[in-house]
Amino acid sequence: MNGMSGSSPAAPAPSPSSFFQHRHRHGGMMHMTFFWGKTTEVLFDGWPGTSLKMYWVCLAVIFVISAFSECLSRCGFMKSGPASLGGGLLQTAVYTVRAALSYLVMLAVMSFNGGVFVAAMAGFGLGFMIFGSRAFRATSSNSHTEVQSHC
């Protein structure tokens, strides 16, 4: 009598193994420990695939995203200034973009691919070295005050 009331019977809940069967059809089981290799999926289904060239593109993208996220964290976009609606909206937009980029890097690292992890950490490290550390800060010969922003 379920058909008469206009509702269909509830679909059975997928079994825990159905996820892994789906993953197996699409190139193997999902890794739950770190592994090394070019055949992986990062952020999107089928990307970067099995191509070594696309794997290197993936690593470069993760590196750039993590370095840019660090740039947004360290540059003067987030510094306080005179109170204004426009300034507050700009700070909010920059903060939101930085948070989104950081979460994308986190999700990429959750692929458990060792190369992706190394690319993310190298991007964050280089971003900090350029935008946050003392390595590239210029000092004035007269007052010995540091330049705070590298942007």
From Swiss-Prot:
Disulfide bonds: none annotated. The lineage of its organism: Eukaryota, Viridiplantae, Streptophyta, Embryophyta, Tracheophyta. InterPro entries: Cop_transporter. The chain crosses the membrane at residues 52-72, 103-123. One of its GO terms (molecular function) is copper ion transmembrane transporter activity. This is Copper transporter 3. Highly expressed in stems and at lower levels in leaves and flowers. Induction: No change in expression levels after treatment with high concentrations of copper. One of its GO terms (cellular component) is membrane.
